[in-house]
């Protein structure tokens, strides 16, 4: 099976459970949003996939090959993460040369071309770059590799608005030109909402949702009006959260819409991915059903 399969992964740090029996699949040929608040468990799982740390229980398969201590898998995956794994004293162009030696699929010309688009000075040492330009260097490497699975862990932290827009533009072009799986792990939901096809939402080490974005948004809606009417309409529905202001109330619902009662003053609106994310992960939010 061409996919990254997560099988019953559990990871604990002392008494803290970072991942709690997590199982799901990143299928080949899609753009995923791997969403969750800071500390939800995203980076821990990415580090397990990348073989940087080991799970306490469970395992990861990439194209039916076990990830743990298997060098063959490393040629299939590249993970761009927040962690600085690069020698600070090496110039960017020297890093490119080293990466070119380790990855047969690295396109040096493309890396230099992307560097120019971002105005990344390849003669600078890595440690001399600002936080934003260190991120740009790592993005450039990821976009210049022809591997089946590319994972971006919080890719736009430190980037200004223009650079973020350029990154998403290059990412979409890259996806259109080469068949691969792209996974964007982020808590910045609004920025990726129009890019991703599938969403995996993780919170407190558990997966709340794995769903096609379009299907998910079709089932999510809000009901607003006088609190009594809202409560009556939503009495048998899967309400994932509320907002209240005086006698007015907004209920956020997942599930099939039903007709409003005759003469009702309630309003039904679509719910965006950001609001869905907030309501599912805030204190007291219900799980997706």
Model feature map: region roles:
Residues 50:
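Helix-to-loop junction immediately C-terminal to a conserved catalytic motif
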Residues 81-138:
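ABC-family P-loop ATPase nucleotide-binding domains
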Residues 150-154, 159:
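Catalytic Walker B motif of ABC-type/P-loop ATPase nucleotide-binding domains
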Residues 58-73:
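Conserved ABC transporter NBD signature motif
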Residues 167-183, 187-253:
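ABC transporter nucleotide-binding domain
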Residues 241-289:
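C-terminal coupling/interaction segments
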């Amino acid at each position: 099976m061409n996919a990254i399969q997560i099988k019953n992964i559990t990871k604990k740090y002392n008494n803290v459970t970072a991942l709690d029996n997590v199982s799901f699949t990143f299928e080949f040929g899609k753009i995923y949003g791997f969403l969750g608040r800071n500390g939800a468990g995203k980076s821990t799982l990415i580090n397990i996939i990348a073989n940087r740390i080991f799970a306490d229980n469970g395992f990861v398969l990439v194209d039916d090959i076990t990830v743990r201590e298997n060098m063959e898998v490393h040629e299939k995956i590249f993970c761009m993460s927040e962690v600085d794994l690069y020698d600070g004293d090496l110039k960017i162009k020297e890093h490119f040369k080293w990466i070119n030696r380790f990855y047969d699929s690295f396109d040096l010309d493309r890396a230099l071309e992307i560097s120019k688009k971002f105005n990344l000075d390849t003669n600078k040492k890595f440690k001399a770059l600002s936080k934003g330009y260190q991120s740009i260097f790592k993005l450039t490497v990821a976009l210049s590799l022809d591997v089946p699975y590319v994972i971006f862990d919080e890719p736009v932290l430190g980037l200004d608005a223009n650079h973020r827009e350029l990154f998403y533009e290059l990412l979409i072009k890259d996806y259109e030109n080469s068949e691969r799986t792209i996974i964007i792990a982020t808590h910045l939901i609004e920025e990726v909402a129009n890019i991703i096809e599938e969403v995996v939402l993780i919170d407190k080490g558990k997966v709340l949702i794995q769903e096609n974005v379009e299907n998910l948004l079709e089932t999510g809606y809000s009901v607003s009006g006088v609190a009594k009417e809202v409560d009556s309409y939503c009495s048998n529905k899967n309400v994932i959260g509320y907002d209240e202001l005086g006698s007015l109330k907004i209920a956020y619902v997942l599930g099939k819409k039903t007709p409003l009662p005759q003469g009702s003053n309630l309003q039904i609106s679509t719910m965006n991915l950001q609001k869905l994310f907030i309501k599912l992960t805030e204190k007291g939010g219900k799980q997706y059903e």
